[in-house]
């Protein structure tokens, strides 16, 4: 019986032997497709290859692609754990031909693999073809020897694939496995096709057409192949299982869950273990690929997945965070095939643990509210969608969990009402927001890009150049010329001005023509490679077609270079100090400062920040050359270059290396090696100095480091030095003795504050003629009573003052009211232990509170506190307590 890892390896090895390039899985967040939330199929990373927008050095490929389907039309979340084949995370095995082989070779490769390599019984296999695809029908008969009744023609869209309304498309052919007549279900196309007897294991897509319009379809000049086979389904078949959760990989994860919870995966507990096993996979892989839990976008989908698993952990009786404890089992099963799991293990573990710790409070509160709201419902009823939305919006309790919790009772949720409430809230939010209108002008840049081509960027080698003005845009419209005082955008054939990207802000400077002069206030990248210069015409006029002299602001660019290079050094130093889980989540490289966001689950200590800064400055002091090379992405990664998550890279990339490592695994090697399109210093010494000035949180699991370099850092340190000198002069000590003197003064102040508090308490107890009612204790109904309005005593000290009053009385009741500077009053009543059976401090302090215009009050029978807004009635409050005591 083959394990999942062996099955995956056999697939890739088979296609490698048959001339295919084995391409690594792309990340779960698509690099080149903003229309997708997650990678959900093997062909996603090849989409631009199929459409002809991208060229690869190979014409056939094979992959084992990690996929997530947990959002949009592919949202299987509700079914996961309760069915045999629904997953949020799965692996798709696929082979691809980009204009190389077509139907015959694709069918031959597929049939030989599953029958000869994997050894499946051909008698248990049948296939489907699109109803008009006679060619595929004939090839299955020829290659596989299948009889006509085992080649089923399907007329629905299930057997015709399209990339979209337009673009490549073509018929499909699916291979099905017959699990046997002991399982209910009919073959595809039959009335019972939804049964579980016949299971699709492989889909072959024959891309042979291009959809031009809804009515027009033409043949592709180079037909292609895209296939996809679910690894988990295939493993179930090869391991003699009918249920994906019974394969070796899931058995190992479920066993770990059973051991951690002490609960067997039996009966109604079975689904919970399955949910946890599945959701652990998707959560871990998403975190490894740079997604962190949040309240929007991909991060929110991840949070929903994690929280659903955590809800099932709670159902299994887990008292403490569970999922992070199961991570080693997952890494053991899949870490060799996907080393990113190993690299990110610490981050995944911390994130799972932290999220579950935070969520337990939300879960407990949400379940209690849900229980109250559904108490009157019975099986078959619908839970109010508005209430479900309130649970989500106010208490952070996701709809998935509401549905999951009510499922056991047979209660549904009115999702239409939930959606309506959600849409209503969004509409209200939109009504309160006014857009900038920038989107309306965005198409202009694509049109100009199509007309003139991409701008040639010269700024790596020079800060000045000559160019030709290709277009002038004013107020979103292309114009022929612009005059003094007008604000416009220029597009030129080439430029030394850097367009904002990779966190580095755009260059500024001057553009000069024969007839005019412009100040460049910003430079942006638009429309796939177009550099747009935002300008103000300062002198004369400019017109399309003119030659122009371009000059970047040298001093500003110099500061940008230093700050950008410093981010690379800080990035590497943070990874050295905090761990390799650290990855860049965002940055701002501005001329005056740099800002750097990284993945890390907790605040950095002052010692960690000190070491990070020291390591970066060590490399700066080396003053070694900063080396830039051009190479392919694969070669760069192979050499250890760090690719920043979410960045889009072409076939050829710039690799920036700087410094020589001095410690650990970096010793003797390049210290920092990153893929980067920004501008950098020539040597590390040009940075001058880096100084970290702050570290803070910007979101769950993301920390922000802000720093200064060069002159800005020196100025900052100079200002700090001047402050210390001024402080030393004020304290009449040397600068080196400031800390000791301040600590001494603080100790002295604390001592004086304690003495002052004690003096105020003694004065209040003794009475000073200004403390209102009751300068001495009096007897009321046989009980000694000491009541005073006290001045100069903080509310927090009233209790200890009351304790002292009890000691003074020996037996009796003490009531003190203090008035703060804003006119509000605080009251305390204390009763000696011998009287608490007769007199309650809580009852008496509530009387005082009422007199002060307050409500309530609380504490113990021997000591209670309250307050009120009307401090002017403090004396009345004391007398009210006396009257109540006499009562």
From Swiss-Prot:
Domain of life from the UniProt record: Bacteria
UniProt key word Ubl conjugation: no
Gene Ontology cellular component annotations, sorted alphabetically: cytosol
Catalytic activity line of the entry: tRNA(Ala) + L-alanine + ATP = L-alanyl-tRNA(Ala) + AMP + diphosphate
Enzyme class: ligase
Gene3D superfamilies recorded: 2.40.30.130, 3.10.310.40, 3.30.54.20, 6.10.250.550, Bira Bifunctional Protein, Domain 2 (3.30.930.10), Threonyl-trna Synthetase, Chain A, domain 2 (3.30.980.10)
GO molecular function, one term: tRNA binding
Compartments, as annotated in UniProt: Cytoplasm
EC number: 6.1.1.7
Binding locations of Zn(2+): 564, 568, 676, 680
Disulfide bonds: none
Cofactor descriptive note: Binds 1 zinc ion per subunit.
Cofactor: Zn(2+)
Keyword Phosphoprotein applies: no
GO biological process: alanyl-tRNA aminoacylation; negative regulation of DNA-templated transcription
Keywords: Aminoacyl-tRNA synthetase, ATP-binding, Cytoplasm, Ligase, Metal-binding, Nucleotide-binding, Protein biosynthesis, RNA-binding, tRNA-binding, Zinc
PANTHER family the UniProt entry points to: ALANINE--TRNA LIGASE, CYTOPLASMIC (PTHR11777:SF9), ALANYL-TRNA SYNTHETASE (PTHR11777)
Function: Catalyzes the attachment of alanine to tRNA(Ala) in a two-step reaction: alanine is first activated by ATP to form Ala-AMP and then transferred to the acceptor end of tRNA(Ala). Also edits incorrectly charged Ser-tRNA(Ala) and Gly-tRNA(Ala) via its editing domain.
Family to which this protein belongs: Belongs to the class-II aminoacyl-tRNA synthetase family.
Entry domain remark: Consists of three domains; the N-terminal catalytic domain, the editing domain and the C-terminal C-Ala domain. The editing domain removes incorrectly charged amino acids, while the C-Ala domain, along with tRNA(Ala), serves as a bridge to cooperatively bring together the editing and aminoacylation centers thus stimulating deacylation of misacylated tRNAs.
UniProt-listed NCBIfam families: alaS (TIGR00344)
Record's protein name: Alanine--tRNA ligase
């Amino acid at each position: 019986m083959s394990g999942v890892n062996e099955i995956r390896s056999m697939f890739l090895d088979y296609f490698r032997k048959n001339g295919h390039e084995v391409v690594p899985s792309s990340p779960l967040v698509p690099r080149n497709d903003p229309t997708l939330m997650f990678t959900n199929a093997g062909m996603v990373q090849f989409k631009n290859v199929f459409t002809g927008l991208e060229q690869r050095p190979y014409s056939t490929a094979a992959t084992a692609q990690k996929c997530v389907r947990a959002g949009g039309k592919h949202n299987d979340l509700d079914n996961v754990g309760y069915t045999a084949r629904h997953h949020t995370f799965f692996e798709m095995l696929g082979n691809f031909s980009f204009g190389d082989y077509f139907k015959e070779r694709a069918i031959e490769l597929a049939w030989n693999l599953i029958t000869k390599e994997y050894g499946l019984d051909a008698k248990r296999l049948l296939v489907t073809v699109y109803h008009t695809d006679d060619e595929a029908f004939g090839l299955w008969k020829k290659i596989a020897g299948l009889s006509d009744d085992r080649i089923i023609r399907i007329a629905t869209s299930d057997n015709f694939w399209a990339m979209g309304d337009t673009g490549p498309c073509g018929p499909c052919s699916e291979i099905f496995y017959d699990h046997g007549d002991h399982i209910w279900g009919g073959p595809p196309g039959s009335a019972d096709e939804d049964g579980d007897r016949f299971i699709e294991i492989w889909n072959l897509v024959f891309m042979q057409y291009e959809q031009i319009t809804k009515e027009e379809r033409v043949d592709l000049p180079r037909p292609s192949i895209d296939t996809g086979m679910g690894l988990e389904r295939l493993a179930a078949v090869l391991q003699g299982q009918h249920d994906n959760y019974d394969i070796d990989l899931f058995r190992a994860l479920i066993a770990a869950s059973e051991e951690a919870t002490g609960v067997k995966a039996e009966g109604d507990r079975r689904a919970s273990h399955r949910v946890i096993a599945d959701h652990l996979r998707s959560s871990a892989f998403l975190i490894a690929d740079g997604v962190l839990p949040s309240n929007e976008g991909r991060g929110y989908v991840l949070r929903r997945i994690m929280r659903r698993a955590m809800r099932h952990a709670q159902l299994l009786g887990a008292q403490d965070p569970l999922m992070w404890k199961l991570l080693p089992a997952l890494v053991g099963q899949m870490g060799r095939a996907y080393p990113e799991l190993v690299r990110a293990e610490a981050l995944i573990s911390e994130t799972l643990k932290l999220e579950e710790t935070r969520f337990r409070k939300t879960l407990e509160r949400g379940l209690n509210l849900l229980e109250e709201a559904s108490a009157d419902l019975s099986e078959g009823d619908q839970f109010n969608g508005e209430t479900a939305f309130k649970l989500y919006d106010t208490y952070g309790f996701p709809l998935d969990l509401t549905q999951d919790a009510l499922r056991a009772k047979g209660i549904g949720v009115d999702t239409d009402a939930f959606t309506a409430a959600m849409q209503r809230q969004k509409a209200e939010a939109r009504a309160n927001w006014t857009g900038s209108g920038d989107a309306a002008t965005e198409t202009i840049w694509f049109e100009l890009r199509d007309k003139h081509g991409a701008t040639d960027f010269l700024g790596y080698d020079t800060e000045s150049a000559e160019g030709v003005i290709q277009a002038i845009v004013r107020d979103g419209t292309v114009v022929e010329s612009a005059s003094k005082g007008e604000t416009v955008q220029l597009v030129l054939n080439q430029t030394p001005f850097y367009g904002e990207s990779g966190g580095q802000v755009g260059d500024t400077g001057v553009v000069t023509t024969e007839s005019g002069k412009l100040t460049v206030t910003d430079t942006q990248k638009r429309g796939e490679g177009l550099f747009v210069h935002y300008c103000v015409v300062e002198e004369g006029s400019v017109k399309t077609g003119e030659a122009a002299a371009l000059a970047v602001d040298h001093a500003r660019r110099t500061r940008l270079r230093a700050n950008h290079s410093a981010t690379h050094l800080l990035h590497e130093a943070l990874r050295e100090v905090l761990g390799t889980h650290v990855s860049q989540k965002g940055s701002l490289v501005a001329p005056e400062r740099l800002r750097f966001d990284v993945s890390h689950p907790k605040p950095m200590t002052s010692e960690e920040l000190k070491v990070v800064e020291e390591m970066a400055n060590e490399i700066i002091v080396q003053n070694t050359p900063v080396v830039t090379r051009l190479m392919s992405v694969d070669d760069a990664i192979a050499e250890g270059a760090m690719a920043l998550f979410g960045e889009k890279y072409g076939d050829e990339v710039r690799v920036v290396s700087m410094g020589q490592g001095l410690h650990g695994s970096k010793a003797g090697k390049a210290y920092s090696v990153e893929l980067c399109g920004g501008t950098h210093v020539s040597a590390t010494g040009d940075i001058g100095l880096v100084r970290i000035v702050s570290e803070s949180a910007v979101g769950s699991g993301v920390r922000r480091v802000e720093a200064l370099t060069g002159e800005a850092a020196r100025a900052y340190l100079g200002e700090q030095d001047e402050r210390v000198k001024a402080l030393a002069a004020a304290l009449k000590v040397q600068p080196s003795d400031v800390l000791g003197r301040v600590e001494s003064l603080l100790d002295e102040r604390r001592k004086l504050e304690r003495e002052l508090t004690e003096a105020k308490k003694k004065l209040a107890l003794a009475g000073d003629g200004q403390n209102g009612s009751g300068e001495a204790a009096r007897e009321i109904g046989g009980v000694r009573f000491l009541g005073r309005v006290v001045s100069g005593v903080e509310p927090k000290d009233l209790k200890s003052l009351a304790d002292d009053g009890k000691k003074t009385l020996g037996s009796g009741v003490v009531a003190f009211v203090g008035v703060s500077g804003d006119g509000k009053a605080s009251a305390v009543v204390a009763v000696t232990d011998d009287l608490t059976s007769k007199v309650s401090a809580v009852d008496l302090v509530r009387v005082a509170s009422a007199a002060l215009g307050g409500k309530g009050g609380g504490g113990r029978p021997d000591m209670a506190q309250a307050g009120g807004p009307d401090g002017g009635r403090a004396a009345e409050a004391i007398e009210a307590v006396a009257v109540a005591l006499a009562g």
